[in-house]
A protein has these predicted regions:
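Active-site cleft segment of glycoside hydrolase catalytic domains centered on the general acid/base Glu
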Residues: 116, 122-123, 155-267, 278-289, ...
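Short, acidic/polar
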Residues: 83-95, 182-189, 250-260, 338-344
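N-terminal substrate-binding region of glycoside hydrolase catalytic domains
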Residues: 67-181, 201
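Active-site beta-loop-alpha junctions enriched in small/polar residues
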Residues: 80-84, 108, 145-147, 205, ...
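C-terminal motif of bacterial Sec signal peptides marking the signal peptidase cleavage site
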Residues: 16-19
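Glycoside hydrolase catalytic-domain groove-lining segments
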Residues: 260-321, 342-346, 351
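Short, low-complexity, disordered segments immediately C-terminal to signal peptides
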Residues: 21-47
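Aromatic-rich peripheral "rim/lid" segments of glycoside hydrolase catalytic domains that contact
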Residues: 314, 319-320, 355-410
Length: 410
């Protein structure tokens, strides 16, 4: 989410259209020499570890790579949930009952270490959750790992953290090997979920410092292209996009869009994030012009990848410095925000889906500052922590029906 990065207008490092279509990129020094992931089988030990047995070339395991790609379509109204343990049968029933069609699932770096021979526990759990959701009829939007995060270390000092599982050996963004390994990892993720996940969100809010830290613009753009390239090699039918917190530094965010989207782009849709009336100035109405501006540049379908409004009536640490004019923060205002925003999203035919942040409240300590009383990541839920409903969930259920009716008329 949410920090401002100074404007760095550095040259773009483009990948070719052939690379996006599944060909080899420049300086491909990956240990997977044929550009594909080896044949993989998994063995789970009595300790719960999942070991990957690599026995051959993926040339023997590719399925339906020559099948025609499906057109991008409406994914509907959905939610994000970073805690895969929440995807229980009870949760799935709640989502279905409230007309939720899509769910965003986060995938950290898939391997336990730099060898790339052992799948991480977090990846195994996320993969199982995605399969469960897809099998239940939801469209799963998979999100790949991002470079890291500017957060609090054990002493409370703000520093660059490799908290998405990327090995330190592959976090050197001035080296070609790093980008080869990022493509290799996303290729594996996409291939292993090929039957279940078609829509992929690449990285996370690359236009702000929080998730890119010391990287230059050229490195950030190369990272995105490398990851998208890997996804499309793993699943040529994949639909890739990025999410931008576009009104923090609009000039910089628009520069990213202009350089990442175009005729040779690996990206198929653009995601927009916003926290208006709480972390950012404005309100539900701010979305209208925001969508128009960025769609005009990208010329791609839009997914509202993060939108939310906190429900607590009190804010002792002033975590949410902005107010939605004419509204008193609380559960009713949260529900009103859902209804007001969804009317705007429905009006914009270029919007093919929405992902509310997030499914339920949490008491997790803020990773950015380390203060146990900070609610930056805690109070956005459309459900309470115990999965009981809020008025916002009913508002979302009603808006979801309206969204689907409007899109069927297009």
């Amino acid at each position: 989410m949410k920090k401002v990065l100074s404007l760095l207008l550095l040259p773009m490092l483009f990948l070719s259209a052939a690379a996006c279509a599944g060909g080899s990129g420049k300086n491909d020094n990956s240990t997977v020499t044929d550009g594909k992931v080896p044949t993989v089988s998994t063995v789970t030990t009595d300790k719960g570890d999942t070991t990957v047995q690599i026995t051959g070339s993926a040339a023997d395991t590719v399925q339906n790579d020559d099948a025609p790609t499906t057109p991008i379509g409406n994914i509907g109204v959905g939610v994000t949930c970073g805690d895969t343990s929440k995807f229980t049968d009870e949760t799935i029933e709640i989502l279905k009952k409230n007309n939720i069609q899509c769910v965003r699932v986060v995938f950290l770096y898939p391997f336990r270490d730099a060898s790339g021979k052992t799948v991480s526990d977090s990846f195994s759990k996320a993969r199982a959750a995605a399969i469960k959701l897809a099998s239940a009829g939801f469209t799963v939007v998979g999100q790949t790992f991002w470079p890291g995060g500017m957060g609090a270390d054990s002493s409370g000092q703000r520093t660059w953290l490799l908290h998405t599982g990327i090995p330190e050996a592959y976090a050197r963004y001035d080296e070609d090997l790093t980008y080869d390994k990022m493509a290799e990892a996303t290729r594996y993720i996409a291939r292993s979920l090929k039957k279940y996940v078609e829509y992929w969100l690449v990285s996370n809010e690359p236009d702000i410092e929080t998730y890119t830290g010391p990287m230059t613009d050229a490195q950030i753009l190369r990272y995105i292209n490398s990851c998208a390239k890997g996804i499309k090699e793993g699943n040529p039918n994949a639909k890739c996009g990025i999410n931008l917190l576009g009104l923090v530094n609009p000039a910089r965010s628009k520069l990213f869009v202009s350089r990442l989207y175009g005729n040779d782009s690996c990206l198929d849709w653009l995601g927009l994030d916003g926290y208006f009336g709480s972390l950012q100035a404005g309100g539900a109405e701010t979305w209208d012009d925001y969508i128009t501006q960025f769609h005009a540049i990208a010329k791609k379908p839009i997914i509202i990848t993060e939108w939310s409004y906190p429900s607590p009536e009190t804010d002792p640490l002033n975590t949410f410095p902005h107010q939605w004019e004419g509204h008193v923060r609380g559960k009713k205002a949260q529900a009103d925000f859902v209804s007001a925003c969804m009317k705007i999203f429905i009006k914009h035919e270029e919007v093919i889906g929405t992902l509310w942040y997030q499914l339920c409240d949490s008491d997790a300590v803020c990773w950015e500052c380390g203060n146990p009383d900070c609610r930056l990541y805690s109070d956005w839920g459309i459900l309470c922590e115990d999965l009981t409903g809020k008025p916002a969930m009913q508002a979302m259920a009603e808006a979801s029906v309206a969204f689907q009716k409007a899109r069927k008329k297009q």
